[in-house]
Amino acid sequence: MKSKVFMVLLLTMALMVGTVGIASASGIFVFGTSGDAVRLDPGNVTDNESMERMDNIFECLVGFKPGTTEIQPWLAASWDISSDGKEIVFHLRKGVKFHDGTDFNADAVVFSFGRQYDSNNPYYQYGEWALWKALLGAIEKVVKIDDYTVKFVLRRKNAAIITSLTMMYAVAIVSPTNAEKYKEDAFKHPCGTGPFKFVEWVKDDHITLEANENYWGGKPKLDKLIFKVIPDPSARLMALEVGEIQGMEYPNPGDFNRIKTNPRLKLLTAPGMNIGYMAINTGYGYKDANENGVRDPDEPWVKTPGYFEPLTKKKVRQAINMAIDKQSIVDNIYMGTAIKAKNGIPPFMLGYNDAIEDYPYDLERAKALLAEAGYPDGFEVTLYVMPVSRAYMFDPPKIGEAIQSYLAAVGIKVEFYQLDWGTYLQEVEAGKHQMCLLGITGDTGDTDDFMSICYAPNSAAIGTASNRAFYNNEEVQNLISKSLQTYDKAERAEYYKKVQEIIHEDAPWVYIAHANQNLVFSATVHDFVISPTSRMFFYPVWIE
């Protein structure tokens, strides 16, 4: 314990030396984060670390009113949807400039979307466009009508399309001129229309943004916004206490009393639209989505690199679910700042199936299921453990240790596999894991955000998978597809409830917890509004 405290002190002292004077300057805000960004291209990322930075650099056609999931205009001033739901015309905001001084217009919108779906586009080669394929494959094309009007033509009606256009991932508008200048390195030099402009990125240390004085919404109150990487939450809190940073994410729940009793700090907390899970690689994915963002019917299912025969068996996956005491994890690791999960969507979302009974913590039944599956003595398996804290999982190593202990009790020996964050994501998207810790924070407020990204077989393409269990139940895919063909919420809810029933039976995930959002700020920081989707918008923030 003494050595751990000493290392935390050393880390904090190093931080103070490296950033001395930054926090004391007027209008400079330093936010402590658990990990670095992977890329700064909204079309080509799936991680929240990257998105936290880009929330302040880029903008979408539509967005949410602060603190809600109520849709409002953003770079689009208005829009019209055809009666059959297959065409959407957006009327764009005029007088908006990119950070490089070029105009935001219809050409920029067509470019930002076209590079993701048009394989003949010269910029298509620079990305994997994973979330386009997962959520936006219904878009056939985006066409320019005039300089400030664009039309989205859909292949099929999609009830979630407008909410999907709020999520920053895949749909934020980038500067075509900047993309042409930097080509495959554009993700290192982001250029949007947002309230802050990119200045520098020192890998694994910090990203600096500065106020966009020509921002169409008015200049931000902050002069500079710095995202400082401090992986250890105790070190982040110490840095906040001594004034080297003004805000931080993912505090240790055990430090809440310390935070609440410090008059120089304030804790912001709200329910999280998230799920933390352990994905069990069921063994089969497919090579790539077609131009519609879906798997062709004749595309074969092939073994993933992490194929492991025991995990392909339903009874084994059910046994794993029964061997893990999730309530203990919530009580002792989340320390009551989360609720135990039994389904893959939060309880307040459309279609949540509360009638499902969670797998009980039952070691004897788990052992019996393993024996029935042909593994009475268990087996050895690897678990990928995230190197960073997330909104849905505050302390992945501790959760991994708990799972390791629980599964050992039924004869399953778990070996940890740890990588840097960027490599971790690449390997689980490629299906190299046997089991992995991950999760999702909803970006759109729509249940489809969870269903199409996490649970749909169409999202199990090896190399870009967001369905990290590589779960390939075709009935589930059909139900998710049907849910997007109607605007009737009751009908959509029934489809989602059925999906949850099927997934519960097949058990490709261990759903662990729905965590609260927890952020800590200096008491001198004002007007930060927690987003239900965990977005990090610092535009309105000011410091006394």
Identify the function of each model-found stretch.
Residues 32-83, 114, 191-192:
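N-terminal lobe/hinge region of extracytoplasmic solute-binding protein
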Residues 21-24, 64-67, 86, 93-123, ...:
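Extracytoplasmic/periplasmic ligand-capture domains
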Residues 91, 128-177:
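Surface-exposed binding/hinge segments that line
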Residues 512:
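Active-site-proximal polar cores
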Residues 176-177, 336-356, 518-523:
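Mature extracytoplasmic/periplasmic domains
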Residues 519-544:
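Long beta-strand-rich cores associated with HINT superfamily self-processing modules
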Residues 1-9:
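Bacterial N-terminal signal peptides that target proteins for export
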Residues 9-18:
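Bacterial N-terminal signal peptides
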